[in-house]
Amino acid sequence: QVGFGPMTYGFSYAPYNDLKAFEDACTENTIAIMIEPVQGEGGVHPATKEFMTGLRKFCDEHDMLLLIDEVQTGWCRTGAVMSYMNYGIKPDIVSMAKGLGGGMPIGAICATEEVSKAFTAGSHGTTFGGHPVSCAAALAEVNELLNRNLADNAKKMGDYFSTKLEKLPHVKEVRHQGLLVGVEFDDTIGGVDVKHGCLDRKLLITAIGAHIIRMIPPLIVTEEDCDKAVAIIEDTIKSLEK
């Protein structure tokens, strides 16, 4: 959160994947819980199924809404059309952007019929939410994603890619959900060093924290593409050992 303050008023915060901490953070005035199904900026930490199903149950028992942020995880990125579908739950409100527009700026929210009754005209608007060009692009994008069943490819290739990455030297842990992949190295390998080395070798990745890299490959990625990426990362790691 450094560099993004001051934080929005009215929120209480709790440790990720800690259901009891979330329950303890709620009061009689709490109206909703908002959560990312995968913490991408934190180093790719997927929520556990127990955590997500527990949140849904807790919200139901206390008449609270469950809001899920799918801006980064939505539209086939995680091996399902929406990441929450991996957990077998149904949220009350879902926010989405990024993958929805296929490169065009757009934002949208979806809500259950019951929740949407509380909306008035414009109350859920966004700058590019209803722009006709962005909406046309989003419609084409969604049709392409669904017709080509790219969620299944994301799941298959995410598993394949992660299995290959786990075999690389100095890899401490690989975390992924579909094609949202994080690799944590041991203390001898810096994430920024790997990022720069990969960029020199024409592979674009990003670094998070001291020893983590994050990759978000195209949804149409193939095994051959994954193999090339792994080879570049391995070559970069070996160059850093010298």
Q: What is the predicted role of each segment?
A:
Residues 1-242:
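Conserved N-terminal phosphate-binding loop of PLP-dependent enzymes in the Aspartate aminotransferase
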